[in-house]
Curated annotation (Swiss-Prot):
The keyword Signal does not apply. One of its GO terms (molecular function) is photoreceptor activity. Keywords: Chromophore, Disulfide bond, G-protein coupled receptor, Glycoprotein, Membrane, Phosphoprotein, Photoreceptor protein, Receptor, Retinal protein, Sensory transduction, Transducer, Transmembrane, Transmembrane helix, Vision. Its main location: membrane. Disulfide bonds join C128-C205. It comes from Hemigrapsus sanguineus. It is a multi-pass membrane protein. InterPro entries: GPCR_opsins, GPCR_Rhodpsn, GPCR_Rhodpsn_7TM, Opsin, Opsin_lateye, Retinal_BS. It holds the Pfam family 7tm_1. It is found in: Membrane. This is Compound eye opsin BCRH1.
Length: 377
């Protein structure tokens, strides 16, 4: 094993080589002997990265961890406390929060520990495989849960009362199916189809997407199709048709209002336009965030298998992985906490949270009482 004491001491400015490391040293030279067998030949072609990257990534992951714990923990807590939130649709939201929270608690602490311990994998090879499998399980579960959430919203908005109703039994089945799919596609590397290896700057573990044999290629193509392309297609299909259905509905409403009352048309147009813009923006944000976070990592995987892998540097692999895991931070805010019912639950159960959402039932009662008072007078 290469001597890592010298470079670590020298990085503060010997100036003998880039970042103070001896010439010819690679990023793989810092890996302990017990996990050397998990380093792919690809990583021996790259010099060590600036050590400050390890500390920067550690700080970023700590920041994301705090946000993820707060957001996903809040969603689960509110669901357990508020009876009004215990609906079949919200079961999918809670399943998403649960998978994101498990990703956080199983992947973030070891990664941060490695980052602040010199940027090396500090655990055993077996734990590297477990770490990668847990990240794969929770990541795939989140992707498929998002797919099911988008399809449920499509069914509600586009089919309305004519579509099949989401029951508690169906929601339970869908949540279970997401976990079965994720576990089913994450276990094969333990049995010889595909493998888990050290990745990027070698302080985390993931799929092997560089070895170009039939075993690795077929496994990675399958997970790309079933764990990225298919759910991505459903998500895009759902939100495209949601936006189309909303615009078609509002156009029909405007036409009807125009026939009935020209005065109401003006007031309805302003409100309708705001609603259209708000829903279109929400759909665009949902789809855009999903693709922004997951597409770079999927692209790196395919390039590593089928394209020019020389351009895939340690940092170029690490940053897309960070982007993909950041989903666990924004998901609870986009899909739950921004919803009026969740905000109302925060107001009721956590009044110190500085969220003041009005109960629509109270508003209706006040309006009704005001109307009755005016009629009596």
């Amino acid at each position: 094993m290469a001597n890592v004491t010298g470079p670590q001491m020298a990085f503060y400015g010997s100036g003998a080589a880039t970042f103070g490391y001896p010439e010819g040293m690679t990023v793989a030279d810092f890996v302990p002997d017990r996990v050397k067998h998990m380093v792919l030949d690809h990583w021996y072609n790259y010099p060590p990265v600036n050590p400050m990257w390890h500390y920067l990534l550690g700080v970023v992951y700590l920041f994301l961890g705090v946000i993820s714990i707060a957001g996903n923990g809040l969603v689960i807590y509110l669901y357990m406390k508020s009876q009004a939130l215990k609906t079949p649709a919200n079961m999918l939201i809670v399943n998403l929060a649960l998978s994101d929270l498990i990703m956080l608690t199983t992947n973030f602490p070891p990664f941060c520990y490695n980052c602040f311990s010199g940027g090396r994998w500090m655990f055993s090879g077996t734990y590297c495989e477990i770490y990668a499998a847990l990240g794969a399980i929770t990541g795939v579960c989140s992707i498929w849960t998002l797919c099911m959430i988008s399809f449920d919203r499509y069914n509600i908005i586009c089919n309305g009362f004519n579509g099949p109703k989401l029951t508690q039994g169906k929601a339970t089945f869908m949540c279970g199916l997401a976990w079965v799919i994720s576990v089913g596609w994450s276990l094969p590397p333990f049995f010889g189809w595909g493998s888990y290896t050290l990745e990027g700057i070698l302080d985390s573990c993931s799929y092997d997407y560089f070895t170009r044999d039939m075993n690795t290629i077929t496994y990675n193509i399958c997970i790309f199709i079933f764990d990225f392309f298919l759910p991505a297609s459903v998500i895009v299909f759902s939100y495209v048709f949601i936006v189309k259905a909303i615009f078609a509905h509002e156009a029909a409403m405007r036409a009807q209002a125009k026939k009935m009352n020209v005065t109401n048309l003006r007031s309805n147009e302003a409100e309708t336009q705001r609603a259209e813009i708000r829903i279109a923006k929400t759909a665009l944000v949902n789809v855009s965030l999903w693709f922004i976070c997951w597409t770079p990592y999927a692209a790196i995987t395919i390039q590593g298998l089928l394209g020019n892998a020389e351009g895939i540097t340690p940092l170029l692999t690490t940053l897309p992985a960070l982007l993909a895991k950041s989903c666990s931070c924004y998901n609870p805010f986009v899909y739950a906490i921004s919803h009026p019912k969740f905000r109302l639950a925060i107001t009721q159960h956590l009044p110190w949270f500085c969220v003041h959402e009005k109960d629509p039932n109270d508003v209706e009662e006040n309006q009704s009482s005001n109307t009755q008072t005016q009629e009596k007078s």
